Amino acid sequence: MILKSFLLGNLLSLCMKIRNSVVVVGLYYGFITTFSIGPSYLFLLRARVMEEGTEKEVSATTGFIMGQFMMLISIYYTPLHLALGRPHTITVLVLPYLLFHFFWNNHKHFFSYRSTTRNSMRNLSIQCVFLNNLIFQLFNHFILPSSTLARLVNIYMFRCNNKMLFVTSSFVGWLIGHILFMKWVGLVLFWIRQNHSIRSNKYIKYLVSELRKSMARILSILLFITCVYYLGRIPSPIFTKKLKETSETGETEEETDVEIERTSETKGTEQEKEGSTEEDPSLFCSEEKGDPDKIDEREGVNGKEKTKDHFNLKERWYNNKTVYRDQEDNTAYGDGNQEDWELKALKLKEEKKLFWFEKPFITFLFDYQRWNRPFRYIENDQFANTVRNEMSQYFFNTCPSDGKRVISFTYPPSLSVFGEMIQKKMSLCGMKELYPKDKNLYNHWVSTNEQKRDKVSKEFINRIEALYGGDIVLQKRVRLCNDRDEKECLPKMSDPFLNGSYRGTIKELYSNSIINDPITSTYNSGEKFWINRIHSLLFCDLNDQAIRNKSSEIQEIKKKIPQRLYRLTTDLEQDEGEDERESVEFPEIRSRKTKHMVIYADNEENTNIFTHTGAGTTYDPENDQMEEVDVIRYTQKPDFRRDLIKGSMRAQRRKTVTWEMLQINLHSPLFLDRIDKNPFFYFDISRIINLIFRDWTKKKPEFQTSNFKEETKKEDEIEETWETIAFGQVIRGFLLVTQSILRKYIVLPSLIIAKNLVRMLLFQLPEWYEDFKEWSREMHIKCTYHGVQLSERKFPKNWLKAGIQIKILFPFYLKPWRKSKLRSHHIDHPMKKRKKQNSCFLTVWGMETDLPFGPARKGPSFFEPIHKELEKKFKKGKKKWFLFVRIFKEKKIWVIKRVLFIKGVMKELTKANPVFLFGLKRVYDGSENRKDSISNNKTISESPIRKSPIRTGSMDWTNSSLTERKRKDLSDKTTTIRDQIERIRITRDKKTNFLTIDMNISPNETSYSDKRSESQKPIWQVSKRRSTRLLYKWRYFMKSFIERIHRNVFLCMINLPRINTQLFLESTKKIIDKYISNDEKNQSGIDEKNKKKIHFIFISTRKLLSTISNKKTNNSKIHCSLSQAYVFYKLSQKPGIKKYRLGSLFQYRRAYSIKDRIKDYLEIERIFHSESKHKKPGNFGMNEWKNWLIGNYQYNFSYTRWSRLDPQKWRNKVNEQCMIKNKDSKKTDSYSYEKDPLINHERHILYSADLLQNHKKKLSKRYRYDLLSYRYINFGNNSSIYRSLLQVNEEQRILILSSHSHIIHKYEQLNLPAISDYLEERFIVDMEKKTDRKYFDLRIIKFWSRRNTNTDMDLRINTNKKNNTGTNYYQMIDKKDLIYLTSYQEIYPRNKENNFFDWMGMNEELLYRRISNLALWFFPELVLLNDAYKTKPWTIPIRLLLFNGKKKITETQKMNENKKRDLGILSNQKKYLELGTRDREEKKWWDQEDLRPDTKYQEYFGSDVKNQKDVELDVWYREGKSREQEDYTDINKSRKKKQSKSNKEAELDLLLKRYLLFQFRWDDSLKKKMINNIKLYSLLLRLMDPKKIVISSIQRGEMWLDIMLIHKDLPLTKLKKGGVFTMEPLRLSRKWNGQFLMYQTLSISLVHKIKQQTDRRYRETKYIDENFFDLFIPRNGRVFVNGDNKNYDLFVPENISALRRRRELRILSRLNPGKGNINIIFSNRKKIQNCKPFLDRGKHLETDTNKAIKFKLFLWPNHRLEDLACMNRYWFDTNNGTRFSMSRIRMYPRFGIS
């Protein structure tokens, strides 16, 4: 096994070495580069396909490989790299080459003239093939960009050490891949040539041959298309726009490119001569001011490789204008060696003269100062020119990391230059090198880390041992002390062990003026010091005296802002004349293509259009000589040239795709799937299936989406159609004018005449006047092509060519009748009222549209009101008809019943008469048999009655044929069966005791055959027979008749009161249940149908009705019988509650005594048994308690809701959640308030008082129920909290109530709103989604109005101002707290003394507590803060609230202050409450308020308060006064500066200066209103009578009158009042505490169940349950924290150390390369278990120590990603926001408990 593992380990290590080797990586990259097939492969494939010979194939392949090899060599050979990497070099080479290439393909005979085949390599065509492949391989990376794979070589260059080996291996890999690719191409071509099917088919053979012949032309076309495709997006660099440079000052620091020749653009030759190479201090502090042009960091001149830093230094020689020079002799003092510096300057000057001819040639080909990236000009208002970017993207240098030297690509350039300068000085001074080349650097680094780790871990173990000894040792900041015993430490400003805010801020000790001042300067005095020690190290020159003499010229090092050379202007700025400098010949920046449309031209001279009245207007129309007013119109075509700098180099966009032949916009491939495209072309299978099978399903979408895109697309299509048609605008213009004339003067008057004629024919009054009056309001305004309104009569300029629109104002719609204002039923509801259509545009078809070229809209229909009216009348007639039919049916049924009753009576009469009046046949009776009927027939036939007149008829019937007899027998059988069925039904109905009137019980009832035969007899015979039968059976008939009357009438009369009483009681019970427990009925979840019928509830209901009627006068706390019954009934139905005994309840003699009926019922239900009093119920656990609480929706929260709520907040705010208002309960009142709030105000106040009184009764009743439930549930507990109050005396009961007020009196502490206005729990969460709108109801706001006090709205007329007189409606809502703060103690003085913490009366009894429910009209997020302040006002400890000051404002003072107040509230006592200005109020406040604290305050704090009271008050008074004085001194200063400012304006300026941010709100709404005003003003200038349209525009809200007041010198106050200027305070960021951060860390793994049940007061008992870790469940809760805040940090062991030591210990424990990254200290369980005695002792932290150790091990993970974020920032220098994305991933494991 050991051998196998050894071999396996070696194999893996070998594989890892092979995989990470440079050769393998190079081969891999080179092989992949083969697949980046670019345009250079065109020539290579051309030689293969065209079969031009083996020589050309070999030359093409050779040139291709040589080109790739040259590209690899150029990486190490700098001149070749510069030659191939310069854009102007490529420009010079490519354009002639392309010209030569196309000339070569078209004129081959010129080059192949006199060519022989003797030596084929001398043939010019073969050499050209070689050059084609060679040159295009070089061009591939620059002109024709290839894919990213080709550039992977350069990326990996900075990662490997052996770069030459990597380049060689990558070239070999590329060569292998290329050979394989060419072999594959050859095999494919060979297969095509040898394929029999291709050769046998003459068509394919012909196509192949033609393809081979035209291959050269096809490849040339492809090459040309490719070149145009890539070059088309880049302007030609030869003809560029040369921009004019601006005049530069000494403050501007120029940035030029790295080439020496470019310095000729700088200004001033003296500054080029002067300067310093190494003494430039700006190099030490300035960052690399990189330009985007500086992408290639390695440059070279004369074949020598130089780093970028050398060129940066040379830039300073020419460009730096802040060098230190002597202004008198113009000599530099750089090194002190002045002659060497002059020689260098002369050499550079000669070099510059040598290259004079290069400057115009190079700038002609390629402008180095081109605006290429960014190519859009972002103007900066603070500076004249744009600011350059000051940090280059990449700078490469080596730096030590993890014991190795690694290349860093974001190394600070200034640090690199500084390091080189230090290195040179150290080598000159003979010192050691700064970076020693030690081979054991890595080992040294590892050993140093191990020592640090051991040191820190040893310190950590010592601290744990100190904790074990009993001391709480938490590391604090170390101070530098002189004497440890006396603790004499250095001050924090000078302590080197402290950092951050402890050290204070560094102040500037001197300025330039102080240094340069010869009197105050300290350089010439005896104290001569160096500003910087590094400065002395760098400038260690022998001749340092000269430097000291010139040190007065040293200025403060400061950073100059680099600016570009140009100050650019746009086309629009030049047209508008906004540019203040000299007008240039052409603007440099292209603006959007615009057209200026003149909307007003002043043809008359000195015409004063505007009339100005009022003293405040400063506008002078004489100075404003405005000839024309024009509006800029932008073209709707896409303009890619906007905001581009002319001559700028466009960036080649590599991340754009084109998928259409003609594409309008550029798109990124990231959003390709979101763009509408052809699904058949892109193989979008799902969309194709939807298109095919969409009509089959015939399913409409669930939500109808707006077709906004389709509508805009249709509008554009219509507009494009008119523009593409020849003379389209002319035709459209004439059509619009024709439609306008037809509509206005022909169509609409004709319709009006026709309508009124029809009304006259229908005998109705005509409406000539109303119709023609509305018709005259319709106006047709001529507009421009884009909708700018001009005039009603004047056409726009060139409207036939440019186009025209006609806008209709107040369009006329024909109506069948006019609604009368007196008819109230026609008035629409304000919510249902549609927005009136006031304007539209006319189309060429005479239709109306909202927008030009938009879809036609439907106007109000003429026949729709008629149709609706007819429908109403038809419905009314239909109702009347159905009512008539129903009444007719009822009458018909009544008549039928009466007829049947009479027939029954007649039957009975005939049955009772035995004598036959006439000689007729006896009627067949179903009860007799067949023989009886035959014998009867015989007797009848033999009787002497045959002599009667019907004798022949009877003789014919007896002598009938055989068929008639058979038919008679069949009918007899059917009647017999029917009679039997009817008899069975009668007997069955008799058994069920159901009696009906229509049913005949007698057995001698006439059968079906009797009825049939009777219909054939005369009436007199029937009546005779029935009368005889009735006389015969009269006794039986009377008997049955009396029985029917008894059963149907008397029994119903007896049972009717009982049934009605029962129904009445049940309905009354439902109403009372709903009244008493409206919330419980919706929450209990118990079906009303399955409730037990408790009979004594019905009996007690009647008694309760009398108590409810007297509810206002009854103030007693005695329970009614229904309340007890209801409580016990609820207790009996709870499934989690066992029916235990309540013996002590029945023995209690006070208000909780129980009726005898309830006792009996409880004994029947086995809730109470007297013989089992000694048994105690079991203790109820949390699960039973949770099941008990599920019945109420307030308690039925999800785990997420439980995790968000604290138990105490939950108990104090069970019903103060942000719940939805039940709209039905207050709908009518809220609507009446919307109509007239002032009229209904008094009615609402009265209703609110009743609601408050009812609400208090509900609270007291609910409290009694809950108290009884508490005692019942917790009867078996031994704790004093649940002790039964029935077994103690009165004193003990009061003691228990006072000690546990949070349990018993919890509902008295609540201010609960009415529950009848709320819905169930499922609507609580998504409150804003469910409601349609927020209702505003004044009932919600309860003021501090007592029983005999109401608060009215103050309606005062302010007559103090002379000019403006108006009525001010002051709302009580905004100042609702002010009412109580000032008038409370006057109206309701308190007899008892105030507590110290009774701020603003917060701890008052519930009787005087107001009920606020602001969640329904205010923002619900702010209501939580308001409620928190009401429940715990000490969370905002304002010093003013500490003292119960009492106002002493008299009536006369109030009346005098009325002149300067804006608020007024009139109570019933006619007391005004006003606020004055700040200075007067503060003065009165200090003078008139009693600031002495209460006696409770002194008793609470003892004697210390008496001693410190005066001191604290004095300090507080003096602080307030000093602050006020400072504020007023600032105000006085501002008054001296601006005498015109008032007191309020000065205060506003002071407020803005200190505390507020302000901005000018130029939002979309303001912009839109300004544009609407411009349109309206342009329209008004051309109207003949603009008065009507002005009034209508103001009424419609189109004209914003506030903007008309804005002119040039508008003061700040007017802007603020108009809403243009807004003030917002600074927002404070939230500071999280340690507990919250710990909860955020652990909440992903743990949550404690105790958080769902326990109260915060119980957590402070410093006790934890034994089953602590069994209660952990995943997520949805906060972490359990012990109540002792002092030892809270001991849960996390790393909190023992300081923050810096923690991070250091964690990182060093991970950076342990020699031992497999194992943290021995913290992974060893035995060492941690040594802390067991410490964990067991004191504080009752845990009982199970092993579980606690597991918990602490969990809090100490081996790998913390938060540390990786810090390491990522400082080690890898990724200074962006992505480093914190790793810290969002929590990799803490789930805490498993064994």
Swiss-Prot record:
InterPro entries assigned to the protein according to its UniProt record, in alphabetical order: TIC214 (IPR008896)
Comp. bias intervals (Basic and acidic residues): 259-276, 286-307
Keyword Nucleus part of the UniProt annotation: no
Subcellular location field: Plastid, Chloroplast inner membrane
Protein's UniProt name: Protein TIC 214
Region (Disordered): 244-307
TM annotation in the entry: 23-43, 64-84, 87-107, 124-144, 172-192, 218-238
Quaternary state and interactors: Part of the Tic complex.
Cellular component, GO, one term: chloroplast inner membrane
Family per similarity comment: Belongs to the TIC214 family.
Summary of the function given for this chain in its UniProt record: Involved in protein precursor import into chloroplasts. May be part of an intermediate translocation complex acting as a protein-conducting channel at the inner envelope.
Keyword line: Chloroplast, Membrane, Plastid, Plastid inner membrane, Protein transport, Transmembrane, Transmembrane helix, Transport
Biological process annotations from GO: protein transport
Annotated source species: Amborella trichopoda
Top-level taxonomy: Eukaryota, Viridiplantae, Streptophyta, Embryophyta, Tracheophyta
Composition bias type Acidic residues, residue spans: 248-258
UniProt topology in membrane: Multi-pass membrane protein
A matching Pfam family: Ycf1
